[in-house]
Amino acid sequence: MATERYNPRDAEPRWQHQWEAGKVFETKNDDPRDKYYVLEMFPYPSGRIHMGHVRNYTMGDVVARYKRARGFNVLHPMGWDAFGMPAENAAMERGVHPASWTYQNIASMKAQLKVMGLSLDWSREFATCDPEYYQRQQHLFLDFLEKGLVYRKQSKVNWDPVDNTVLANEQVIEGRGWRSGALVEQRELTQWFFRITDFSQDLLDALDTLDEWPEKVRLMQKNWIGRSEGLSVRWELDPATVPGEEKEVTVYTTRPDTLFGASFLAISADHPLARDAAAKNAEIEAFCEECRRAGTSLAALETAEKKGIDTGIRARHPFDPNWELPVYVANFVLMDYGTGAIFGCPSGDQRDLDFARKYDLPVVPVVMPKDADPQTFTIGDEAYDGDGVMINSRFLDGLSAEEAFETVASRLENDLLNGTPRAERKVNFRLRDWGISRQRYWGCPIPVIHCDDCGVVPVPKADLPVTLPPDVTFDKPGNPLDRHPTWRHVACPQCGKDARRETDTMDTFVDSSWYFTRFTAPWEDNPTDPKAANHWLPVDQYIGGIEHAILHLLYSRFFTRAMKATGHVALDEPFKGLFTQGMVVHETYSRGEGAQREWITPAEIRVEEVDGQRRAVHIETGEEVAIGSIEKMSKSKKNVVDPDDIIGSYGADTARFFVLSDSPPDRDVIWSEAGVEGAHRFVQRVWRLLTEAAERLRAVDAAPASGGEGLAVSQAAHRTLKAVEADYDKLAFNKAVARIYELVNAMAAPLTQVASGKADNALTAAVKDAAAILINLIAPMMPHLAEECWREIGGKGLIAERPWPKFDPALIVENEITLPVQINGKKRADLTIARDADQSAIESAVLALDAVKAALNGGRPKKIIVVPQRIVNVVV
């Protein structure tokens, strides 16, 4: 009888070696079985995996192992999203080349992932910084360019004068570069763009087909695409107030019904009217410059104080030339949305109301609730943006907002200003073309050449890849490619004269927008093998963080359409199923206050309970430290747990089991030492129960019981098998864990009976059948333990290669039913009884219940109402 504790340090490497030696997880494209493609968002090689990685990749691995067992040909690959800023920062700070830093990190993280026992097809591995990968990306760029999906234009950018690079809007914090802290400048640069807006309507409409995506993600993408139907209205300007030659300003609005509530117009700092006004007024010029520096990210616009400056320009109301409104430059109006000009209706929009109150502008209610009194309805601190009827709107009074929209649109479409209609209906999208130019070294080179005679010339495909020169220096800010003495100088492919390479590299989001396609045939000379891509795609289950809900997923959807347009794939949508997992979070620990606060790692802390109160003690000094909030694990607050430490102490299976067990997978899981220890105790319990009975289990063939002593354990095993199948299908891993705990509890006594030699052959055979089911159930989550237990009970081959067991329908039929029992209509008890019990048996059993006896107090009920298979009501 085996009684040794399970030793993951011995077992886990052994099984990992066996899987690898047998190429168990390598996938063949010509396998005739139904395909299943499961993919977790590939990692950036930062150097170490964290517990978030462990949770993400464990979830994907459970799906892969389960689907493999269910008979699918599973593709479960891994690669590295390897270009990007951190490698260049490391080069500047540590004097190490980005390539060296990146590939060293890949080697470290790959070793860590292998220790987790993931069933990955490593034969398809690549990094996006491999020339073999970005050669095919350059090929795609040239195909998109030929198809008209890529173009260049002058674009306003956020320029960091210290780092000498373009910053995304999100990287501008209160007007300063997120890294350098320098005041950001606005510059006009020629940038490369992908025409994602060509697909705006399709990207929006197709969201309705993605029924295996979270509704939250679909809504986020819908809002980001931002389709709106409105009216472009031309407002005549009072010529006496205009500093330049402009005679009118066009405003796009989705609420023309509120025109009579307008009290101001607001324009972007980059609007031609603003530039004209700024040229003649230093105060306006300074304000416009402040707006440009502040950043134009959604977060910046929504959180910044709403400010404006009166330009002195006056616009005439479209329905009343005697009514003039002031034109402000405002920091919340963007030049690249609509026309860069809006009208403000303070009564119907909170932002406009705040602005109007600040600058003492009129607030006229124009929509009120249907049951309100127009004589008394007013606007206080909050704008009214609900449905209702029009008031204070002349010929619109009494109409609904929808009717007023149509009335205004119809009138203005038929009203002429300077010989053309004053308004036209427009559909606008918030989505903008994707600017991919980055003034960085560590990215995919853009494969074009600039010739003074021929203009922009694509690099011939035969000359791809355009590789990054290795001999660059990072001793000064800016793009090393601009400074390279030879790399940028090249002969023009068309005329042969001296020319220059493009020194911008591609946004790293490009690299991750098609990698899932490359995994289908990473050895192919072209970007894809269309046959393989069309076979494997779409990805059946994609798993990753909610933070990628918009950009990465939207860009990938665009890329798939662009690749279809250029003949590389035959589908539109890359991901059939999407799952966004929660984070791994942990308590924070600290000592000191304010600027003196010092964060302390969990490894330095011992948590004690004194008089029912938890307290944290610094192990080395013995001093009590503050227990803070539970937050996402982060290096800055040091509330991180190193997966290597956990796996080293408890084994990979314990870590895997814990991150799946505590919370629904789409919610955060709180890391706790007690939780990990609990998972480890369960691992040891399963091992002990099975190995103590293993010798006798090996001596019999597995056979479920149809009656007798073994029936209960067979029913428990087969019912659990059916339920866990459904849980795995729905990615409800925490529910599967709970059921497996229950099954082990149900099996404990029979296993002990077998181990002690007190079970007959029929019971032993039933227990072996249940044990085989249990091992198969835990195999996706705890694959090493499953292999070890399978070997112990005499199983043949690898669990990783075994088909999923089938439940016996006869054993999952519930022979009993639980009925709620009411007394005078209020539930007082539950009755468990045979499903086929007749009315008389049910009544007798009900009368024997303690709650019913107490209510009757020795008497008889007036009547007992039995609703078959549903409920019992006792009337007393």
UniProtKB/Swiss-Prot annotation:
PROSITE patterns: AA_TRNA_LIGASE_I. A motif ('HIGH' region) lies at residues 43-53. It catalyses: tRNA(Leu) + L-leucine + ATP = L-leucyl-tRNA(Leu) + AMP + diphosphate. ATP binds at residue 635. Its main location: cytoplasm. Pfam families: Anticodon_1, tRNA-synt_1, tRNA-synt_1_2, tRNA-synt_1g. It is found in: Cytoplasm. It comes from the Bacteria. Keywords: Aminoacyl-tRNA synthetase, ATP-binding, Cytoplasm, Ligase, Nucleotide-binding, Protein biosynthesis. InterPro entries: aa-tRNA-synth_I_CS, aa-tRNA-synth_Ia, Leu-tRNA-ligase, Leu_tRNA-synth_edit, M/V/L/I-tRNA-synth_anticd-bd, Methionyl/Leucyl_tRNA_Synth, Rossmann-like_a/b/a_fold, tRNAsynth_Ia_anticodon-bd. GO terms for cellular component: cytosol. GO terms for biological process: leucyl-tRNA aminoacylation. GO terms for molecular function: aminoacyl-tRNA deacylase activity; ATP binding; leucine-tRNA ligase activity. Its EC number is 6.1.1.4. A motif ('KMSKS' region) lies at residues 632-636. PANTHER family: LEUCINE--TRNA LIGASE, MITOCHONDRIAL (PTHR43740:SF2), LEUCYL-TRNA SYNTHETASE (PTHR43740). HAMAP family: Leu_tRNA_synth_B. Belongs to the class-I aminoacyl-tRNA synthetase family. This is Leucine--tRNA ligase. It comes from Rhizobium meliloti (strain 1021).
